[in-house]
From Swiss-Prot:
Nonessential protein required for the fusion of transport vesicles derived from the endocytic pathway with the Golgi complex. Can be partially replaced by GOT1. It comes from Saccharomyces cerevisiae (strain ATCC 204508 / S288c) (Baker's yeast). Residues 103-111, 167-172 are lumenal. Signal peptide: none annotated. The modification N-acetylserine is found at S2. The modification Phosphoserine is found at S60. It holds the Pfam family Got1. Present with 279 molecules/cell in log phase SD medium. Belongs to the SFT2 family. InterPro entries: Vesicle_transpt_Got1/SFT2, Vesicle_transpt_SFT2. One of its GO terms (cellular component) is Golgi membrane. Residues 2-81, 133-145, 194-215 are cytoplasmic. This is Protein transport protein SFT2.
């Protein structure tokens, strides 16, 4: 059996090494191309998202105000304070008339209920003028405020309905009293520790009622 000359073995080994180097270079180039393509697409996507975010960011204080309130709700702080005071004065006038003219209005409880309801609505809506309509609407529909909001506006509308349309004196007086409770709760809840005190009083009242009724 004849052996290959050393020169042939060297050439064969050199050819094998060259082929291996070429294969490795091709694989490396393919990996580099795929990495470049992946990085380029990722960079383009990131750049596009950054441009979208930049375009949606407010560039001035006016943009922030427009995002919060529509143009017809935009009032200056002075205008809101003036309207707030006007609403409070209107509510005070209604409550004062109800108090001093109670002997006269007692004979006409439906008119008393309407006047009291008007004062209650002016009192509550005054804070809406001060905070802004959308912000106040979110405040009233918050989880901790929603039960009160539903109770208060339900009693107001029921008082108006029974006083102006159904003309039921007993139900008008009942709804007006419930409305008074809602307004007092609303006013006290904004005092320091007012909400905590109301919860303590309500829980104590419920416990006392359960003790009396043996529930």
């Amino acid at each position: 059996m004849s052996e290959e000359p050393p020169s042939d073995q060297v050439n064969s080994l050199r050819d094998s090494l060259n082929r291996w180097n070429q294969t490795r270079q091709q694989n490396s180039q393919g990996f580099n191309e795929s990495a470049k393509t992946l990085f380029s697409s990722w960079a383009d996507s990131l750049n596009t998202r950054a441009q979208d975010i930049y375009q949606t960011l407010p560039v001035s204080r006016q943009d922030l105000v427009q995002d919060q309130e529509p143009s017809w709700f935009q009032l200056s702080r002075t205008e809101r304070m003036v309207l707030f005071v006007c609403f409070l004065l209107g509510a005070t006038a209604c409550f004062t008339l109800c108090t001093f003219l109670f002997p006269v209005l007692a004979a006409k409880p439906r008119k008393f209920g309407l006047l009291w309801t008007m004062g209650s609505l002016l009192f509550v809506l005054a804070f809406g003028v001060l905070m802004g309509p959308l912000a106040y609407l979110k405040h009233l529909t918050a989880r901790e405020r929603l039960p009160f909001s539903m109770f208060f506006f339900a009693t107001c509308f029921m008082t108006i309905y029974f006083a102006a349309f159904s003309k039921n004196t007993v139900l008008t007086i009942t709804c007006a009293l419930l409305e008074l409770v809602a307004v007092i709760y609303y006013a006290i809840s904004y005092f320091p520790f007012g909400a905590t005190g109301l919860r303590m009083l309500s829980s104590a009242g419920v416990n006392s009622a359960r003790g009396v009724l043996r529930i």
